């Protein structure tokens, strides 16, 4: 009677039985990189081997972030090691959030606070700075600019359309010799305000001499201290020169102050 033949299984089947179907996941670290090897079944129910490579880098994080990484995991990740698990966690790009209150948001949308826009404009060189800080102040460029403005203002005064209203003779430009009741002509007089205390008659003459000839200048001074009281009167020989002076000097920066120039108001007797 023949003996029963022993049926031997292959070594691959024995290995598969020993590992319970799939080998365990392994991790190795070499040359600053971590290699994670895992096994799984694909759609065709075939065993596949997946190797993931991670680059190990060190970074400085806030204490709260480092403490949060030590929290005890739960659920499907209860037995996972520190760090994300590819089976349960999907790592996306880092998003940095910045919280703004309503006031900061309004300031951010305010076009007047746009640093790319400069509200300052020089009256001398048309640069993006105040006229007081102009590097060309007092140079030939400043002189030419004042002469051009004076010519333009004089031409505008001459070419101004005449209205049908009655104009007294002493107010007409053609009646330059006609004087008022006080014995002087104030039609070509201007008042310059916001002058500094250190202003002198020589400074006042230097300020207006390039615009046109003057017949009289008066700088108001304090009787006790002798310092300038902040205003002065200049009488030009021609009314068009006075108009040009108002056009040029009104709003002009002088001695760290912004001048205010207007027509001199006649005094009541």
UniProtKB/Swiss-Prot annotation:
Record SMART domains: RRM
Keywords: Cytoplasm, Initiation factor, Phosphoprotein, Protein biosynthesis, RNA-binding
Keyword Transferase attributed: no
Modified residues (Phosphoserine): 198
Any one GO CC term of the record: eukaryotic translation initiation factor 3 complex
Localization per Swiss-Prot or TrEMBL: Cytoplasm
Stretches assigned to the RRM domain: 188-266
SUPFAM superfamilies: RNA-binding domain, RBD
Record-linked Gene3D superfamilies: 3.30.70.330
GO MF, one annotated term: mRNA binding
Pfam families cross-referenced by the UniProt entry: eIF3g, RRM_1
GO biological process annotation, one example: translational initiation
Family to which this protein belongs: Belongs to the eIF-3 subunit G family.
Function: RNA-binding component of the eukaryotic translation initiation factor 3 (eIF-3) complex, which is involved in protein synthesis of a specialized repertoire of mRNAs and, together with other initiation factors, stimulates binding of mRNA and methionyl-tRNAi to the 40S ribosome. The eIF-3 complex specifically targets and initiates translation of a subset of mRNAs involved in cell proliferation. This subunit can bind 18S rRNA.
Subunit structure: Component of the eukaryotic translation initiation factor 3 (eIF-3) complex. The eIF-3 complex interacts with pix.
Record protein name field: Eukaryotic translation initiation factor 3 subunit G-1
Organism: Drosophila melanogaster
